[in-house]
């Protein structure tokens, strides 16, 4: 029998799609943070985002990951609203 070409820890399709959602959210948050006018606030928010994603990196429960993505999207929308108000 031939050995599988996939590494033993290959992601399932569902895990791969979730991972893509998380990475997209992370990139969107970092892009939004770039628009923060204050250097110190921008640095604080970048560090906060990085630490939050690192802290939750080991999460494997599907429901937990989905909940964190939802919370992240809500926080992103709040940040975007705050930036829009600050710029108007």
Curated annotation (Swiss-Prot):
Transit peptide, start-end: 1-19
Entry's Gene Ontology BP terms: mitochondrial respiratory chain complex I assembly
The UniProt record lists the keyword Protein transport: no
Record InterPro entries: Complex1_LYR_dom (IPR008011), Complex1_LYR_LYRM2 (IPR045293)
Subcellular location as annotated: Mitochondrion
Highest rank taxon of the organism: Eukaryota
Functional description taken from the UniProt entry: Involved in efficient integration of the N-module into mitochondrial respiratory chain complex I.
Protein name, UniProt field: LYR motif-containing protein 2
Gene: Lyrm2
